Regions:
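Solvent-exposed interaction patches of small proteins and small membrane subunits
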Residues: 1-131
Length: 131
């Protein structure tokens, strides 16, 4: 991934984080009034992060991982991102699958509680990759 593309994708993640921050600290009822918007922001955060990680793995000669989850974990193993962040982001991959594929009924209380960790983890991703 070229440095320009990486910067552009990290900038997109920063913009999505700004959008998500508007919902930080809202009540559950307020969340439910905007849950489709928040779901989409979370989906975009996860997909952009996955795209970055897949490209960075590929640039290191790694075969494409079969899942988003495994791509985040492999990035941690290779030192592309910290182990802590790789574990946290791997959990977000499961959330993405639920949102996109509706494998399970969405538990909105879990989604609501995921806002602070998403803000923390994707901010950390920018900090670790924007070197």
């Amino acid at each position: 991934m070229s440095p320009d593309v990486l910067k552009r994708k990290l900038s997109a993640i920063a913009n999505y984080l700004q959008d998500l921050r508007r919902h930080e600290g809202i009540t559950f009822d307020e969340f439910m009034a905007h849950h489709y918007e928040i779901e989409r922001i979370l989906e975009l955060l996860i997909m952009n992060a996955s795209d970055i990680i897949m490209h960075l793995l590929s640039s290191k000669g790694e075969a494409p991982p079969s899942t988003y989850r495994s791509s985040f974990l492999r990035a941690g193993e290779l030192g592309i991102i910290s182990i802590e962040l790789s574990r946290n982001l791997s959990l977000s991959a499961g959330l993405r699958n639920i949102l996109v594929h509706e494998y399970e009924e969405i538990d909105y209380s879990v989604l609501y509680r995921s806002i602070p960790s998403a803000l923390r983890d994707f901010t950390m991703l920018i900090a670790e990759l924007d070197k």
